[in-house]
Amino acid sequence: MHEERKMKFKELEKILLKDGWFLIDIKGSHYQYKHKNKKGKITIPMHRDDLALKTANSILKQAGLK
């Protein structure tokens, strides 16, 4: 069976913060970030389990980091 690779919430958050994203809101288990120079906002789910790598890569793409 294929085991899905995962990324921890804190790892992904660290990458975003280093790029200049900052926390603007928390709605339940979803953390929202904005950037001073980039459009839009990024939402990261913080659930009990780690994020699927596919989800983490999608978030990084939205942030302009992939």
Predicted regions and their residues:
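Cytochrome P450 catalytic-core helices
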Residues: G28
